[in-house]
Curated annotation (Swiss-Prot):
<keyword id="KW-0378">Hydrolase</keyword>
<comment type="function">
    <text>Has a low ribonuclease activity.</text>
</comment>
<feature type="disulfide bond">
    <location>
        <begin position="64"/>
        <end position="118"/>
    </location>
</feature>
<keyword id="KW-1015">Disulfide bond</keyword>
<dbReference type="GO" id="GO:0050832">
    <property type="term" value="P:defense response to fungus"/>
</dbReference>
<keyword id="KW-0732">Signal</keyword>
<dbReference type="InterPro" id="IPR023412">
    <property type="entry name" value="RNaseA_domain"/>
</dbReference>
<feature type="signal peptide">
    <location>
        <begin position="1"/>
        <end position="27"/>
    </location>
</feature>
<keyword id="KW-0964">Secreted</keyword>
<feature type="disulfide bond">
    <location>
        <begin position="89"/>
        <end position="96"/>
    </location>
</feature>
<dbReference type="InterPro" id="IPR023411">
    <property type="entry name" value="RNaseA_AS"/>
</dbReference>
<dbReference type="InterPro" id="IPR036816">
    <property type="entry name" value="RNaseA-like_dom_sf"/>
</dbReference>
<feature type="active site" description="Proton donor">
    <location>
        <position position="149"/>
    </location>
</feature>
<dbReference type="GO" id="GO:0045087">
    <property type="term" value="P:innate immune response"/>
</dbReference>
<feature type="active site" description="Proton acceptor">
    <location>
        <position position="42"/>
    </location>
</feature>
<protein>
    <recommendedName>
        <fullName>Ribonuclease 8</fullName>
        <ecNumber>3.1.27.-</ecNumber>
    </recommendedName>
</protein>
<dbReference type="Pfam" id="PF00074">
    <property type="entry name" value="RnaseA"/>
</dbReference>
């Protein structure tokens, strides 16, 4: 009887571990719309050092995010990207849009540490980006479409 119980508990712990591992590091907080979360994660009109900027993001998940890109633009500028022609996203949805041209951005890549002591290296560049856009949700600005996901840097 005891070995069967031990096997059951081990299986339960394994399943629990797999379930916890599936929670994405960039999971959107429940009290934010997708657009608000994009603004929190990726909008930074005035560049900041990655180590301090990433602390503001990592506190939501209490994990070190591996990679993050900050766009040094106002939300209104990124929202105008949603007015460019639709293109396919990495996930094959057709709600992505490419920026009008290169934009100033910073890429932060995790180099070491465990939360809350995450350490990042930064890379500054000017490059176009692709963002996914959707109709606004309650609490979003009143644009016809709002950016909800930074799909990639081109």
């Amino acid at each position: 009887m005891a070995p069967a119980r031990a096997g059951c508990c081990a299986l339960l712990l394994l399943l629990l571990g797999l379930w916890v591992a599936e929670i994405p590091v960039s999971a959107k907080p429940k009290d934010m719309t997708s657009s608000q979360w994009l603004k929190t994660q990726h909008m930074q009109p005035s560049p900041q050092a990655c180590n301090s900027a990433m602390n503001n993001i990592n506190k939501y998940t209490e994990q070190c995010k591996d990679l993050n890109t900050f766009l040094h633009e106002l939300f209104s500028s990124v929202a105008t990207t949603c007015q460019t022609p639709n293109i396919a996203c990495k996930n094959s949805r057709k709600n992505c849009h490419q920026s009008h041209g290169p934009m100033s951005l910073t890429m932060c890549e995790l180099t070491s540490g465990k939360y809350p002591n995450c350490r990042y290296k930064e890379k500054h560049l000017n490059a176009p980006y692709i963002a996914a856009c959707d109709p606004p949700q309650q609490g979003d600005p009143g644009y016809p479409l709002v950016p909800v996901h930074l799909d990639k840097v081109v």
